[in-house]
Amino acid sequence: MYTYMEYLQKCFFHATRWNEDNIYSNITASSHALLEFLVPSGLKMDVSSRSSPNSASSFTLSNHHSLNGSLAYMYSSTQLKGTPGTRRIPLQDAIAGFKIVEPNEMRPSASGTIAPSSLLYGRMYFPGAALEAMVIRRFSPHTQLLIKCIHNPQLDKNGTLIAYFQKNTQRYSREVIYSTNDALVGFRGLYNIGSTPSWSPSPPNFDRSVVSVGAELWYAARTMSPGLSTGLRYSTRSTSTGKPLTMTLACNPILGHISSTYTVKTSVASTFCSRYDFNLFSYASNLSLGFELFNFDKNAAVERNPQLPTPTTNPSASKQNLINPIRDHSYYQTTPSTNATTYQSSQTISDSFQKLVNRSEFSSVVKVSTSLNDRLVRLLWEGRFKDFLVSSGVKVSLNPATNAVELNRFGISFSYAS
């Protein structure tokens, strides 16, 4: 579950038309959210408040091993309107999960230009003297500077700083990165094949397949250590059901590591993910599986678009249609005519499925992931209780020596924002 400050940062990117999916570091974000989700440890309470449309503050208190907490403040030069508190925030926006990849969603604003904007963030931890800060400066609709720094007396030279200069367009994205840790210099790039060009006036087609190819290159000047990785992402939608799926392939030639993932949204309320890791040098392999299942809010009904015809289905099958919204809908039946008619029909199906997902209201979600080689299971429940967002989970594994079940992690987290 995102913290409220992380949620506001995503709202800032959305308000300034910045597409996070088009960044190389997020190429496996969907599979990571379903397989490597973080389980809370101990008891944690997070309270946030919006003092104005441009600023927010947050207070966090936890008792993991010892009592500690933090104070955070965020300021945005762009007003973050339409950002509700935890009582009204959609559960899909508050939780990291499957993300439909749409490189074309980065469209210009109504005025055609985006004014330069900034976001400032700082957090102070106690007890101790640890500090962290972040600065985001948008120079143009396609370029921004992101700076992150940490000050901690326990770190080498009391802290580190990392800067990203990013250029993000519909066709490609590039990043130049520098870190004071070992004088690390890096370059990342991602290129989309099959997306609509930036000069095209046509709107994006949600059912169009997009192939994204990227790579990153690192070099640590102090230790003279190189780093290299490549990645490929294929995103598409089923023309018969409109359900999206994403496949990725990542490779680290230096370490000989290959990782492939397959993530599919099997229904409006469920997503399945699998990942297979293999090492070319040691021949070690691992299979990881995970899924998420949302629970519909019984007190909220799914809104329908009045412009769409009413489907000719049995009312008793309405709950079943939420699992497969395309079945039994005569409006979505396609007829084998011309290619243009078939394309428009498949586009309507994809668009209808996406609208149903966006308009569905959920009360909670259950996430489960397991790894065969690591022999561990993660279980996480996230949902809404009164005006709070609650996250509770457990992580268990088998002891390799005794085969006994061990409890590695357990906790519960409460989040409130007004």
Curated annotation (Swiss-Prot):
Keywords: Membrane, Mitochondrion, Mitochondrion outer membrane, Transmembrane, Transmembrane beta strand
Cited Pfam families: MDM10 (PF12519)
InterPro entries referenced in this protein's UniProt entry, alphabetically: Mdm10 (IPR027539)
Region forming the signal peptide: none
Coiled coil is among the record's keywords: no
UniProt keyword annotation of Nucleus present: no
Any one GO cellular component localisation term in the record: SAM complex
Membrane topology: Multi-pass membrane protein
Principal localisation: mitochondrion
Domain of life per record: Eukaryota
Compartment(s) of residence: Mitochondrion outer membrane
A single BP term in Gene Ontology: mitochondrial genome maintenance
Free-text note on domains in this protein's UniProt record: Lacks alpha-helical transmembrane segments, suggesting that it resides in the membrane via beta-sheet conformations similar to those predicted for other outer membrane proteins and porin.
PANTHER family xrefs: MITOCHONDRIAL DISTRIBUTION AND MORPHOLOGY PROTEIN 10
Oligomeric and partner information: Component of the ER-mitochondria encounter structure (ERMES) or MDM complex, composed of MMM1, MDM10, MDM12 and MDM34. Associates with the mitochondrial outer membrane sorting assembly machinery SAM(core) complex.
Protein purpose: Component of the ERMES/MDM complex, which serves as a molecular tether to connect the endoplasmic reticulum and mitochondria. Components of this complex are involved in the control of mitochondrial shape and protein biogenesis and may function in phospholipid exchange. MDM10 is involved in the late assembly steps of the general translocase of the mitochondrial outer membrane (TOM complex). Functions in the TOM40-specific route of the assembly of outer membrane beta-barrel proteins, including the association of TOM40 with the receptor TOM22 and small TOM proteins.
Record-stated family: Belongs to the MDM10 family.
Official protein name in the record: Mitochondrial distribution and morphology protein 10
Species of provenance: Meyerozyma guilliermondii (strain ATCC 6260 / CBS 566 / DSM 6381 / JCM 1539 / NBRC 10279 / NRRL Y-324)
Gene: MDM10
